[in-house]
């Protein structure tokens, strides 16, 4: 739906007082060829009835850059032709006549270097409540290399983390301590020890365990690190537990992080809800203190899940990689949380690629050169168990943390047995894959064979079998049918 020529008003009329259509003010240019240094954004827009989609696209470009509702004479005091964002392409969304994909280019000089807070204030700060548009969703972005290089990125990255842990050739295993609220510090530490002793690499706090009346944060840190040290000594492996330092102020978060470091922790955790400035600040602290930063995407579903309005998680994942987290929850596709398999694999691409290629089936609209930025370790967590090990490895490969919370803590023979079941299932599946077997199709047979020699795995398969959460995902690809993982 490219316009054959510019519809911008003549220069003199452009600055006449009054209200003018956005496309006439210069926010639409169907002939524009994006520059390598432009920042590109793709919006899914649903214009109000009777609103021209090109005008709606121009409005998005205007309201996310320099425009207001009327002509202002102070535009003449700026290089406004450069600073105006330009909507340059509008495509209909397949099988949805009310929606359109709107491509917008922004000049790099509109953004502060190394600041996700500044980026988001422009791109999503105002346009989502604009009346001429029923709904808008930010689907994807492309950052120019010059912009990417202003960010330090992950403080540790996948390669360095594996070297510190001395664990290669397989996914990492973890579990979230359950119940996530209510345990005393001592009992919490007990759960951590049992999980790590049974074969897990990590245990972790959940998103809402901070410092409550039933367990002060300092008690939790002390008991957890005692458990980590004892499990490491018992197994001869490097172990860890994600200590959640999320708090009400940055000062308190730094205090908790410093205490975690003083106890010998290799990793701390924060929640997405702390905000972008806090995330970048904690990443800087981790870089200075040789710590791994785990991010729980708490709250993301409030704006990522609905397909017609909000922000796609692939965009959030790109922002988080720039912001500098080492781990982020990215979905399982087979668990209890929202996730179309192809779409979720697109999130993993964003985390682990050196160069992400456009792939519409995975929701990736742009090529992205990550300019040697370190890679993020994706985390699959939420409603998964040992019986799904073949599906998880087939979907996500080795560079992923597989976290079995209920699938460890809920084991009928106890926590340590639950951890052992997951470790044996993982080792058996990796061995079978390395031998050239088709683990996706032969996976259940491989697990049954391994369970003949492992009572905890046999009990896990008997308890959960092939339990899955078969609900239709809401955020699916517009260019490919929802894939089956069975």
Swiss-Prot record:
<dbReference type="Pfam" id="PF00016">
    <property type="entry name" value="RuBisCO_large"/>
</dbReference>
<feature type="binding site" description="via carbamate group">
    <location>
        <position position="204"/>
    </location>
    <ligand>
        <name>Mg(2+)</name>
    </ligand>
</feature>
<comment type="subunit">
    <text>Heterohexadecamer of 8 large chains and 8 small chains; disulfide-linked. The disulfide link is formed within the large subunit homodimers.</text>
</comment>
<feature type="binding site" description="in homodimeric partner">
    <location>
        <position position="126"/>
    </location>
    <ligand>
        <name>substrate</name>
    </ligand>
</feature>
<dbReference type="InterPro" id="IPR000685">
    <property type="entry name" value="RuBisCO_lsu_C"/>
</dbReference>
<dbReference type="InterPro" id="IPR020888">
    <property type="entry name" value="RuBisCO_lsuI"/>
</dbReference>
<protein>
    <recommendedName>
        <fullName>Ribulose bisphosphate carboxylase large chain, chromosomal</fullName>
        <ecNumber>4.1.1.39</ecNumber>
    </recommendedName>
</protein>
<feature type="active site" description="Proton acceptor">
    <location>
        <position position="178"/>
    </location>
</feature>
<feature type="binding site">
    <location>
        <position position="207"/>
    </location>
    <ligand>
        <name>Mg(2+)</name>
    </ligand>
</feature>
<dbReference type="Pfam" id="PF02788">
    <property type="entry name" value="RuBisCO_large_N"/>
</dbReference>
<dbReference type="InterPro" id="IPR036422">
    <property type="entry name" value="RuBisCO_lsu_N_sf"/>
</dbReference>
<dbReference type="InterPro" id="IPR017443">
    <property type="entry name" value="RuBisCO_lsu_fd_N"/>
</dbReference>
<comment type="function">
    <text>RuBisCO catalyzes two reactions: the carboxylation of D-ribulose 1,5-bisphosphate, the primary event in carbon dioxide fixation, as well as the oxidative fragmentation of the pentose substrate. Both reactions occur simultaneously and in competition at the same active site.</text>
</comment>
<feature type="site" description="Transition state stabilizer">
    <location>
        <position position="336"/>
    </location>
</feature>
<dbReference type="GO" id="GO:0000287">
    <property type="term" value="F:magnesium ion binding"/>
</dbReference>
<dbReference type="InterPro" id="IPR033966">
    <property type="entry name" value="RuBisCO"/>
</dbReference>
<keyword id="KW-1015">Disulfide bond</keyword>
<feature type="binding site">
    <location>
        <position position="297"/>
    </location>
    <ligand>
        <name>substrate</name>
    </ligand>
</feature>
<keyword id="KW-0460">Magnesium</keyword>
<keyword id="KW-0560">Oxidoreductase</keyword>
<dbReference type="GO" id="GO:0016984">
    <property type="term" value="F:ribulose-bisphosphate carboxylase activity"/>
</dbReference>
<keyword id="KW-0479">Metal-binding</keyword>
<dbReference type="GO" id="GO:0019253">
    <property type="term" value="P:reductive pentose-phosphate cycle"/>
</dbReference>
<feature type="modified residue" description="N6-carboxylysine">
    <location>
        <position position="204"/>
    </location>
</feature>
<keyword id="KW-0120">Carbon dioxide fixation</keyword>
<comment type="similarity">
    <text>Belongs to the RuBisCO large chain family. Type I subfamily.</text>
</comment>
<feature type="active site" description="Proton acceptor">
    <location>
        <position position="296"/>
    </location>
</feature>
<feature type="binding site">
    <location>
        <position position="180"/>
    </location>
    <ligand>
        <name>substrate</name>
    </ligand>
</feature>
<dbReference type="InterPro" id="IPR036376">
    <property type="entry name" value="RuBisCO_lsu_C_sf"/>
</dbReference>
<feature type="binding site">
    <location>
        <position position="176"/>
    </location>
    <ligand>
        <name>substrate</name>
    </ligand>
</feature>
<feature type="binding site">
    <location>
        <position position="381"/>
    </location>
    <ligand>
        <name>substrate</name>
    </ligand>
</feature>
<dbReference type="GO" id="GO:0004497">
    <property type="term" value="F:monooxygenase activity"/>
</dbReference>
<feature type="binding site">
    <location>
        <position position="329"/>
    </location>
    <ligand>
        <name>substrate</name>
    </ligand>
</feature>
<feature type="binding site">
    <location>
        <position position="206"/>
    </location>
    <ligand>
        <name>Mg(2+)</name>
    </ligand>
</feature>
<dbReference type="InterPro" id="IPR020878">
    <property type="entry name" value="RuBisCo_large_chain_AS"/>
</dbReference>
<keyword id="KW-0456">Lyase</keyword>
<keyword id="KW-0503">Monooxygenase</keyword>
<keyword id="KW-0113">Calvin cycle</keyword>
């Amino acid at each position: 739906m490219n316009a054959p020529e510019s519809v911008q008003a003549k220069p003199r009329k452009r600055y006449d007082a009054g209200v003018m259509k956005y496309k006439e003010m210069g926010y639409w240019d169907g002939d524009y060829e994006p520059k390598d240094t432009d920042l590109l954004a793709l919006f899914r827009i649903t214009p109000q009835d009777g609103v021209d989609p090109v005008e709606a696209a121009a409005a998005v470009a205007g309201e996310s850059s320099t425009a207001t509702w009327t002509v202002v004479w102070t535009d003449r005091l700026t290089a406004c032709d450069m600073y105006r964002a330009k909507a340059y392409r509008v495509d209909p969304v397949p099988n949805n006549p009310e929606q359109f994909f709107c491509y917008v280019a922004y000049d790099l000089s509109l953004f502060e270097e190394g600041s996700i807070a500044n980026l988001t204030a422009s791109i999503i700060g105002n346009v989502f409540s604009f009346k001429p548009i029923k709904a808008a969703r930010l689907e994807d972005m492309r950052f120019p290399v010059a912009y990417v290089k202003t960010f330090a990125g992950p403080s540790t990255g996948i390669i360095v983390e594996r070297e510190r842990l001395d664990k290669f050739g397989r996914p990492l295993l973890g579990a979230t301590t359950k119940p996530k609220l209510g345990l005393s510090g001592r009992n919490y530490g007990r759960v951590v020890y049992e999980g790590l002793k049974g074969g897990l690499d990590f245990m972790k706090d959940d998103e809402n365990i901070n410092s409550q009346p039933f367990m002060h944060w300092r008690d939790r840190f002390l008991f957890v690190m005692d458990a980590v040290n004892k499990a490491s000594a018992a197994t001869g492996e490097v172990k860890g537990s994600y200590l959640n330092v999320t708090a009400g102020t940055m000062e308190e978060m730094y205090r908790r992080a410093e205490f975690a470091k003083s106890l010998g922790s290799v990793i701390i955790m924060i929640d997405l809800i702390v905000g972008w400035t806090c995330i970048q600040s904690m990443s800087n602290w981790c870089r200075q203190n040789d710590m791994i930063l785990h991010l729980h995407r708490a709250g993301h579903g409030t704006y990522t899940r609905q397909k017609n309005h909000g922000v796609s998680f692939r965009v959030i994942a790109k922002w988080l990689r720039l912001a500098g987290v080492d781990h982020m929850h990215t979905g399982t596709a087979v668990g209890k949380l929202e996730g179309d398999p192809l779409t979720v694999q697109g999130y993993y691409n964003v985390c682990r690629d050196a160069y992400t290629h456009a792939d519409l089936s995975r929701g990736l609209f742009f090529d992205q050169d990550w300019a040697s930025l370190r890679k993020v370790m994706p985390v699959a967590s939420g409603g998964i168990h040992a019986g799904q090990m073949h599906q998880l490895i087939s979907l996500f490969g080795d560079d992923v943390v597989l976290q079995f919370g209920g699938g460890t803590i809920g084991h009928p023979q106890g926590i340590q047995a639950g951890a052992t079941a997951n470790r044996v299932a993982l080792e058996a599946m990796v061995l079978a894959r390395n031998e050239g077997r088709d683990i996706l199709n032969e996976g259940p047979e491989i697990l049954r064979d391994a369970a003949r020699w492992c009572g905890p795995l046999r009990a896990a398969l008997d308890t959960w079998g092939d339990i899955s959460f078969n609900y239709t995902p809401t955020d699916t690809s517009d260019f490919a049918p929802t894939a089956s993982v069975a």
